[in-house]
């Protein structure tokens, strides 16, 4: 279940949308390459978009919204690509990292009644209930040292671009 609410705008103050669970199919594909004698492994994976169609229950100020005929809300979760690697280095050291891209730029949620309110207020389709402005990039790079079979120290650097302000 997904529940979304607003509080910031007078028109949509106390607006709530409830999306019941649904099921949809997507796919995942990947390739991996390794050189065991160097403890080297790299992999790339792709996760497809997944299209959902669900009937949202919408309300405002605690009352059900029924401005327009109910239609299914189409939601498409984003595709993504991941690249991961790790390799052993001399003297019990280990280097690892990853790079991830997610296509959030095409992700939006626009329930039927929410869109009808926008139309009635003369706002057209100027904005969606949820909408990201850009794609997300994230990366991680780490270094680890094994002191003994029980003790390992690791240092990691992370960066994430974010996906914009929904």
Regions found by a protein language model. Name each.
Residues 1-166:
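Outer-membrane beta-barrel porins/channels
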